[in-house]
Amino acid sequence: MIGIDGNHAVDRAKAKYMRKRPFAQFHEHTLQPQFEAELINNGSYPSGHTCRGWIFGLTLTELNPSRGNEIMKHAYEYGQSRVICGYHYQSDVDAGRLCASVGFAAVQSSDAFQKQMAKAKKEIAKVLATNKH
């Protein structure tokens, strides 16, 4: 549910702005040149990978707040890797996080989302209790 909401916002922005990716703009290869052909005509702004990573980080942090710092650190680094690899500009990644945050805030009022989160919290509590022994 939240992944779909975040992707919708990202896809609409990508279609509107169609910003060239850094590797295409500067004629330099990414760290994974085999993916360049499929991405060269796909807009850079905002970063969809970052949006998904940030949404997952926010969700997992809500499910297990005691590990929130570690979870969000990984979510942050996942987005930054898109800049390091040459797929995105920093502003693309920042906008991906913003799309994720807005999408995550929007689903908070959904009864369906809250029901699924309640189920997930119970499942995680069981797993965490089992792993303590």
What feature does the model see in each segment?
Residues C85-V93, R97-S101, A105-S110:
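Catalytic cores and adjacent binding grooves of peptidoglycan-active enzymes
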Residues T130-H133:
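Long, charge-rich alpha-helical interaction segments
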Residues M1-C85, A106-Q116, K122-E123, L128:
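Hydrophobic alpha-helical bundle signature of multipass membrane enzymes
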